Amino acid sequence: MTENIPLRVQFKRMSADEWARSDVILLEGEIGFETDTGFAKFGDGQNTFSKLKYLTGPKGPKGDTGLQGKTGGTGPRGPAGKPGTTDYDQLQNKPDLGAFAQKEETNSKITKLESSKADKSAVYSKAESKIELDKKLSLTGGIVTGQLQFKPNKSGIKPSSSVGGAINIDMSKSEGAAMVMYTNKDTTDGPLMILRSDKDTFDQSAQFVDYSGKTNAVNIVMRQPSAPNFSSALNITSANEGGSAMQIRGVEKALGTLKITHENPNVEAKYDENAAALSIDIVKKQKGGKGTAAQGIYINSTSGTAGKMLRIRNKNEDKFYVGPDGGFHSGANSTVAGNLTVKDPTSGKHAATKDYVDEKIAELKKLILKK
């Protein structure tokens, strides 16, 4: 009875010279062809192509030993042969693939591949992972024009900021940047780097910087474009109403936790008269919003402070400040458009109010009339 066995043959092609210089190890049962000679070898999963034996047809019965003839002279050189071909169907001395399929060990390999739906890429990846990728790679350089994807398993990746990561670059003995992303295009479909997490339950930062050097931990420099526009050096947007869009915490001795310096982009003094070092805009919800009740500036000291709560200076001179007790100082005459109510008009540090003066004048008039 004849049994039909589904066959999937994995093979590689190179010239005889390329095979001789190649360190590729064929999988057990994988075929390697010499495209210029038409000969082939069967891989054993251990040796390179040059160490394997050529494939031959079925061995026939041993014939009678004949008499050794005389060695003939060297004949004339024959004409050049036809150009070789890489078309398998046109190769000479082709192995009998049907004979290979009838071998018990070959059938076992093919059945295993069919059961796991293995394809060419899967077989290559498996071979590389078991043979090549177990070795330490020493790359001296190269260019990849396609996409590289890393999908590591859970095991083997350390959660360390120095030796962990699916990709780890150690620059301890090198110069220059560990990673450079560059483009010279006018437009593109995406940014140079994207960090994304789709899960609300993800409990790690999208980016973490651990630094203790002598310069800034993060530098962002935006050059002046040929035509100034409304783009920003840093744009932060948060849709999480339970947290702040940005939190800053520092341990400064004589500096501000947040330092803002505005520089006039022009030599003319009034060129930037409409600019501000700090600008705050409070708006309602963009779609269907009816208003907002948010505060413009909120200052608080949860543990209490002996310093000024607000201090405004010009040319290093105090012009206005609010002390820790709420008292304020103004360095010049001030105009109040509305009413100014003084809670303690008799205080020696406050001027008398109009109501207070009118009341006392009325009392004085009554005393004069009685006399």
UniProtKB/Swiss-Prot annotation:
* Disulfide pattern: none
| Keyword Ion transport part of the UniProt annotation | no
Keywords recorded for this protein, A-Z: Degradation of host capsule during virus entry, Degradation of host cell envelope components during virus entry, Glycosidase, Hydrolase, Virion, Virus entry into host cell
Q: Which GO terms describe its cellular component?
A: virion component
Q: Which domain of life is it from?
A: Viruses
Reaction catalyzed: Random hydrolysis of (1->4)-linkages between N-acetyl-beta-D-glucosamine and D-glucuronate residues in hyaluronate
Descriptive protein name? Hyaluronoglucosaminidase
Native organism? Streptococcus pyogenes phage H4489A
